[in-house]
């Protein structure tokens, strides 16, 4: 038997995709670009002294809905949903993760368009 435990940020995203039937379980290959908050995606990124292009999620759902393990990590562009659920930063090594329960986690689960899309996919799957 497995005892209940708190999910990490990556496990939470993967679980929502799995339950909604949208998770792509393919192994290996090129990194995916999952959808992130639009306000963060449209922020200008500075690359080598110039402004880089805005972040774009993969256009095909099966590409962007791969496991979080395969998501490309851009150091200057953090995924706010995963950051809210204590994903470690890209700048330092992480021996141990923090387990903080904070109000923004509940607000993210209630108000995020990405999570709302997973809930709609689950509802459509159950019909």
Where is each model-derived feature located?
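An acidic, gly/pro-interrupted, aromatic-rich
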Residues: 1-127
């Amino acid at each position: 038997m497995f005892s209940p435990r708190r999910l990490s940020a990556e496990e939470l995203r993967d679980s929502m995709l799995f339950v909604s039937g949208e998770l792509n379980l393919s192994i290996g290959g090129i990194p995916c670009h999952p959808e992130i908050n639009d306000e963060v995606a449209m922020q200008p990124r500075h690359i080598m002294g110039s402004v880089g292009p805005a972040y774009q999620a993969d256009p095909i759902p099966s590409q962007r809905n791969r496991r979080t393990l395969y998501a490309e990590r851009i150091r200057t562009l953090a995924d706010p949903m995963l950051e809210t659920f204590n994903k470690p930063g890209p700048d330092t090594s992480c021996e141990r993760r923090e387990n903080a329960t904070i109000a923004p986690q509940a607000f993210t689960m209630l108000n995020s368009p990405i999570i709302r899309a997973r809930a709609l996919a689950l509802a459509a799957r159950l019909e």
